[in-house]
Amino acid sequence: MSQIDKASRRQKIKDRSRVKVHGTMAKPRLCVYRSLSQIYAQLIDDDNGKTIMAVSSMSKENKALEGTKSEVCTVVGKQLAEMALAKGITTVVFDRNGFRYHGRLKALAEGAREAGLVF
């Protein structure tokens, strides 16, 4: 499968899932983007079109992390969950953004669940 086909396939999956997945202030959308070497996660309130909080593997506190990419993703998930719980957010809607629930995405989700987020 060529790179163009992969990108268009992911975009189709993303568009289909965005119809069903909607975040509010009480239950925001946990949107995850995975690049080749980094991972980015943010909580989004779709009603107001605002990003509530964001964390990534590029953050200052995460740049010095050692280990595999999956281990770093678990730490990022835990950090996001701790920040959300501090703001009083306990439940979220998980938006995998067209990516398969596997590997680094799964590690981030499990880290967030371990830290107390419900989805």
Swiss-Prot record:
SUPFAM superfamilies: Translational machinery components
Composition bias, Basic residues: 9-20
GO molecular function: 5S rRNA binding; structural constituent of ribosome
Domain of life: Bacteria
Renumbered residue ranges of the record's region Disordered: 1-20
Function text: This is one of the proteins that bind and probably mediate the attachment of the 5S RNA into the large ribosomal subunit, where it forms part of the central protuberance.
Record's protein name: Large ribosomal subunit protein uL18
Species assigned in the record: Chlorobium phaeobacteroides (strain DSM 266 / SMG 266 / 2430)
Gene it is expressed from: rplR
